[in-house]
Each structure stands twice: as structure tokens, then as C-alpha cells.
């Protein structure tokens, strides 16, 4: 008969669960090794872990790297993982937002160069601080370059102008 009063295992983690958690810590450590120094500086890490992450790039042999990453995983156990995950998620979402904004501005540039006056009017409605004459001039130069199969120097200027307007409108300048 099975004893239902096995209180010894209540609340304890299985060996498999512990291994999963340790593997997740090692994976998080691997991700931290890919971050730049200024990004790492923003994370709440102990000095010992910072040193271990800096040393991780020195280990190139598979076995040595695996051992060192296990050590990093061990050091990760005493870190504030919720804060680290929150900051990493915030960085990822800001990068995603930046990329989405960048692609949106690229689409505006392409529409203005390939488009007509309607696209220009839509752009001016969305960005009221636009110097219409300057934008028309930049777009016209970009269209001439495109027609002559020249390098897109004027298209870059159109993009820079659009980006500057966007930053001005969003209060980043």
C-alpha cells in the first residue's frame, strides 16, 4: 500500500526540475556574454559575475567554455533574475520598437521617391514641421539618381531628413 503521508517530498524539486533551472541559468549566462559592456553595466550583477562574463570570451575550447559557462550558471543562482529578465525584455522591446520605426521611415522614403504628390501630402499631414520645398528638392534629386542608376546618395539624404523630422516630432531632438 502506498503511504499518502510522504511529507518528505512536498515542496522539493525533482532532480529533472533542478537540471532544467540550471540549464536555463547557463543559457541566460550565454546570452549575457553576447551583450556589450555598456549594456552589461546597466544590469544588476555582482562583480564576480561581471568578471566571469568578461573571461567567458577567452575560453574557446569547447570543454573549457562549457565548464566556464557552468560556473557562470552557478554564479547566476544568487542574482536578481527577475530584474535581469525585466531589463533584457525592456532592451529587446526598445530594439524592436526602434527597428519598426526605422522600417516605417524607410517605407516613407520609398513612397516619396516612387510616389506622387498625394504621398507628399500625406507625409506633410503626418509631419507638419516639414519644409515642403526642401523635401521636394531632395526627392527630385533622388528620383534623378534612381533614373540614372547612380548610387543612392540623395535617397540617403531624404531618409536622414525624414528621420530628423520624426525625431523632432517625437521630442528626441
Swiss-Prot record:
Q: Keyword Cytoplasm, does the record have it?
A: yes
Subcellular localization is given as: Cytoplasm
Q: Name one GO biological process term.
A: assembly of large subunit precursor of preribosome
Q: Which UniProt keywords apply?
A: Cytoplasm, Ribosome biogenesis, RNA-binding, rRNA-binding
A GO molecular function term, named singly, is:
ribosome binding
Instruction: List the InterPro entries hit by this protein, alphabetically.
Output: DarP, DarP_sf
A GO cellular component annotated for this chain's UniProt record is: cytosol
Is Cytoplasm set as a keyword in this record? yes
Q: Into which family does the record put it?
A: Belongs to the DarP family.
What functional role does this protein have? Answer: Member of a network of 50S ribosomal subunit biogenesis factors which assembles along the 30S-50S interface, preventing incorrect 23S rRNA structures from forming. Promotes peptidyl transferase center (PTC) maturation.
| Protein name per Swiss-Prot or TrEMBL | Dual-action ribosomal maturation protein DarP
Protein source organism: Pseudomonas putida (strain ATCC 47054 / DSM 6125 / CFBP 8728 / NCIMB 11950 / KT2440)
What gene name is given for the protein in this entry?
Answer: darP
